[in-house]
UniProtKB/Swiss-Prot annotation:
This is Probable [pyruvate dehydrogenase (acetyl-transferring)] kinase, mitochondrial. GO terms for biological process: regulation of acetyl-CoA biosynthetic process from pyruvate; regulation of glucose metabolic process. It is found in: Mitochondrion matrix. Residues 131-360 form the Histidine kinase domain. PROSITE patterns: HIS_KIN. InterPro entries: AK/P_DHK_N_sf, BCDHK/PDK_N, BCKD/PDK, HATPase_C_sf, His_kinase_dom. One of its GO terms (cellular component) is mitochondrial matrix. Belongs to the PDK/BCKDK protein kinase family.
Length: 401
């Protein structure tokens, strides 16, 4: 069964019926411990049986929300491209809806997952281009911007979760090699936090040196309050932690160099890592001049960036200038019930704080669920002011049950 792919946004016909069906189900939130345990003792057939349904549920939940975006955004070429990618992937996975779990079917499924992963490799950049096209064509009103911000947080954390399922399955039960023999899929049961911090710092420093011809140094302090004197390790997805640290180091270095100048002695970036009974806490402190509270609120907005817009000829690093670095990093932190936030002192510097669950059984996926509440948040019009002045938000933390 194949559906027509004529600019499917909003999705129509038989595809819409399947979306309606699968969006009635809530996604199954897994813990890192569950991922780890299944990777060690699960079978390819059981993983296939779970994934062929769960991927359709997660896709359907977010695709239904996609149809509620402002019509002007859905008409942008890049947005249409993304909607078509999702429709095509949903169709591809529907082919396995009623199939058995024979080794031949599992092998075909693995091949299809690889195709889907490659198809969605540039979803973030392409969706960002859609927003740029919208701004350049007609602008965005405040009500639409709030709805878009709400959707994109959910859309990207949904994408993180889907890629986690796919990569974990393909590494454990497919032909994709793990990063190291110790890894269970994408998960490191004993992730060396200090090593990830240094890798992220050195790579960010390389970019800073190449662009500014100088860079600040780092002072790192580690404190293990659980096993005193021992190195800090946790069960984690190292690539997620690296993504967050690399982004925060880039921001701290850029702010430090631009505030103090390339000819001055640059103050160190100070990093504190503490492992407690419940949390792994990381704080990155720079003396890059900080930002005002007005700007601080906007740093998580997908339609705002402190950098110039990226060139469209591919000469700049992906995401540079899109304004996606911080909001995406926050989603990586929140994905397993952690968090990321900034505290800034204008005229001095900024502290960036990351919290991750130190206990893997408590690190549950935070997943968007298509519901009456999500429909209302995506479609509500301008709100009548009930304060004399704008009241700053409290970090826009996701609701927890």
């Amino acid at each position: 069964m194949r559906f027509s792919r004529k600019l499917l946004g909003p999705f129509v016909g038989s595809l819409a019926k399947k979306l309606d069906y699968y969006s009635q189900f809530q996604p199954s939130s897994l813990t890192i411990q569950q991922y780890l345990d299944f990777g060690r003792i699960g079978t390819s057939a059981n993983s296939y049986t779970f994934l062929k349904n769960e991927l359709l549920v997660r896709l359907a939940n977010i695709m239904q929300e996609f149809t509620l975006l402002p019509p002007k955004l859905l008409q942008m070429p890049s947005s249409k491209m993304v909607s078509n990618w999702y429709a095509e992937s949903f169709e591809d996975l529907l082919l396995f809806e009623a199939s058995d779990s024979s080794p031949e079917q599992v092998a075909r499924f693995n091949d299809q997952l690889t195709v889907v992963l490659k198809r969605h490799a540039h979803v973030v950049e392409t969706m960002a281009e859609g927003l740029i096209e919208l701004r350049e064509s007609d602008g965005v009103d405040i009500a639409s911007e709030k709805g878009i911000q709400y959707f994109l947080d959910r859309f990207y954390i949904n994408r993180i979760s889907i890629r986690m399922l796919q990569n974990q399955h393909l590494v454990v039960f497919g032909n994709v090699l793990p990063e190291s023999p110790r890894h269970v899929g994408c998960i490191d049961p004993a992730c060396d936090v200090e090593s990830v911090v240094y890798d992220a710092f050195e790579n960010a420093r390389f970019l800073c040196d190449r662009y500014y011809l100088t860079s600040p140094s780092m002072k790192l302090e580690m404190h293990n309050a659980v096993e005193k004197g021992k190195p800090i390790s946790i069960v984690a997805v190292p690539s997620h932690l690296y993504h967050m640290m690399f982004e925060l180091f880039k921001n701290a270095m850029r702010a430090t160099v631009e505030y103090h100048g390339v000819d001055d002695d640059l103050p160190d970036i100070k990093v504190y890592v503490v492992k407690g009974q419940e949390d792994l806490s990381i704080k990155i402190c720079d003396r890059g001049g900080g930002v005002s509270r007005t700007i601080l609120e906007r740093l998580y907005n997908y339609m705002y960036s402190t950098a110039p817009p990226p060139p469209r000829d591919g000469t700049q690093a992906p995401l540079a200038g899109y304004g996606y670095g911080l909001p995406l990093s926050r989603l990586y932190a929140r994905y397993f019930l952690g968090d990321l936030f900034l505290v800034s002192m204008e005229g001095h510097g900024t502290d960036a704080c990351i919290y991750l669950k130190a206990v893997p059984v408590e690190a549950s996926e935070v997943l968007p669920i298509y519901s009456t509440s999500s429909r209302r948040n995506l479609t509500m019009g301008p709100q009548v002011a009930d304060w004399s002045h704008h009241v700053p938000g409290q970090g826009n933390r996701p609701a927890q049950s």
